[in-house]
C-alpha cells in the first residue's frame, strides 16, 4: 500500500445546494461517490468516504467502501474531514478529494501525497491546473487561482487576473483553476475548526481554502493535470455521463 502515513478522505453530503443528492447521482451505471472512490483507489492508498447521510453510508457499504458518518453540523467538506480526523486516525496527514470528483486524476493525488511526505509541515497543499477553455475562465462556478513562488495569494470565482483592455486572450498566459485535491496535517485541521464559523472571504466566495489563508497558513500550490469535469450543476451531470462512458471503455 502506497504512502502508509497518509489517508485519502472523501467528504460527501446529500443536501448539495446546486445539485441535491448528487453524491448518489447515477453516472453511466455507477453513483458519483462510488466513481470518486474508485478513482482514489487507483493510487493504492487507503481511502474512506466521510458523510452526514445514511443513504450515502448504505451505498458505500453495498460496494464495500470504507465510510465514516459525521453527525455534527459541518459548514464545508474540510470541516467534515476535520471532524473525522479528530477521532484519532492513525495517520500523519490527510488528502481531501471532494466527493463530486468522479474523474479525479490518481497521478494528481499521488503528486499531492509526495508533497505531503517530503514538503514543509507548516503548509497546506492544494492543486491547480492551467485553464485551456475560455468558458471555464469566465465561469463563476470554477474558482480561479492567483499564485506565485508556489504559494496561493488569492482564489476567486471571478475571472482573475482580469484581462483588461483589448487583448482578452491574455487569460491564456495566466489563467489557473482550482483542482479539488487538498493535503493537510492534523494540526491544520484542528486550527481550521477553531471558531466553528466561516472566515470573511470564505463566506463571500464560498471557497473553503480561503479560511486557511485568512488564518495565516501558507498554501502550497501544485500544478496538476486536473480532471475533465467537477460535477456541480445539472448540466455538469449530463456531461459526466458521456465522459464516464469514455473512461469505462478504456478500462
Annotate each PLM feature.
Residues 51-52, 104, 147, 184, ...:
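A conserved hydrophobic position in a structured secondary element of the catalytic/binding core
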Residues 48, 54-114:
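Short phosphate-binding loop-to-helix
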Residues 44, 90-91, 120-124, 217:
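Short, high-confidence coil segments that cap the C-terminus of an alpha-helix
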Residues 2-3, 172-251:
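Conserved alpha/beta core of the MobA/IspD/sugar-nucleotide pyrophosphorylase nucleotidyltransferase superfamily
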Residues 105-196:
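Conserved core of the sugar-phosphate nucleotidyltransferase
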Residues 3-51:
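N-terminal glycine-rich phosphate-binding loop and ensuing alpha1 helix
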Residues 14, 71-77, 226-228:
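Short, acidic/turn-prone active-site loops that include or flank metal/cofactor-
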